[in-house]
Amino acid sequence: MVVTAAGSAEEAVRRWVDAAGGRLVLDGGLATELEANGADLNDPLWSAKCLLSSPHLIRKVHMDYLEAGANIIITASYQATIQGFESKGFSKEQSENLLTKSVEIALEAREMFLKEHLEKSTPIQHPVLVAASLGSYGAYLADGSEYSGDYGEAGTKEFLKDFHRRRLQVLAEAGPDLIAFETIPNKLEAEAYVELLEECNINIPAWFSFNSKDGVHIVSGDSLIECTTIADKCAKVGAVGINCTPPRFIHGLILSIRKVTDKPILIYPNSGERYDGEKKEWVESTGVSDGDFVSYVNEWCKDGAVLIGGCCRTTPNTIRAIHRTLNKSPNKQQLPAVE
């Protein structure tokens, strides 16, 4: 089931939420799941490396999440930038084509998923959406600054706008349902995104998701409430929330977000494991199990979250458990029939 966007960004997101019965399930970790399927991501391009080496694996992971119950799959473009591809020797045109390819792969996965279920006489009755991921400047640097928000001398709004502008345009032109501004580490980059959405006249609903280091501030130390207010004032932002943050912080963060916005709230935490930015590896035995992760879900729903999924180190099993939990929720609306 494909539900098109119309009206304001917030209205579009609310319509998708309603069509799903009151909650939308996001997918889980992409890069870590690609590694689990045999991909070597030891590269500054991270998951975007698979756009070059193994696009079939990206498609497989998208399909795995759809089969697990995800309503939204997020493209393999979080760390894909024109500048990053050019540093690997690609032309600007080739770099833009790779960005487009990230969206095309997700759209293909959706088409395959819907077709397979139609052929099995089990047509999908909920929205299936593609969100084009746009990671921060820090994600491009691949030096851990996406987890600190400290960009040094590069940290000016005009620099960040110039860095992201063409990338945003290319991703939007590829035809996703949403633009996902993910793991936003500082207030300045949020302001840059808002101005770009207006200047580029992007008419695809966007979401802003920040990451928090302590349950109060985003990772730069900027106030989450101030950052949420920036998103709230932008009509092109349809939802706002948190990603890549330990589950234990989410309850308080949702309550903070609700103080300053009525937009739909999205939550997709990581597994709770700690990432060592210098060693570029996850520290073992610092996270929670799928069962513990999912135990938070009903609380987050009561707090006001309506889009829920997982980030780094979560898997299709995590998303399957979230899907089952939400479908058992007493607040779950009856799914509408497809006309």
From Swiss-Prot:
Name of a matching Pfam family: S-methyl_trans
Assembly with partners or alone: Monomer.
Binding-site list for Zn(2+): 244, 311-312
An MF annotation (GO) of this entry: zinc ion binding
Hcy-binding domain span: 12-326
PROSITE patterns: HCY
Known EC number: 2.1.1.10
NCBIfam families: PRK09485.1 (NF007020)
Enzyme kind, highest EC tier: transferase
Gene3D superfamilies: Homocysteine-binding-like domain
Function: Catalyzes methyl transfer from S-methylmethionine (SMM) to adenosyl-L-homocysteine (AdoMet). SMM degradation (by HMT-1, HMT-2, HMT-3 and HMT-4) and biosynthesis (by MMT1) constitute the SMM cycle in plants, which is probably required to achieve short term control of AdoMet level.
Organism domain of life: Eukaryota
Catalytic activity: S-methyl-L-methionine + L-homocysteine = 2 L-methionine + H(+)
Name of the protein in its database record: Homocysteine S-methyltransferase 2
One Gene Ontology term from the biological process aspect of the record: methionine biosynthetic process
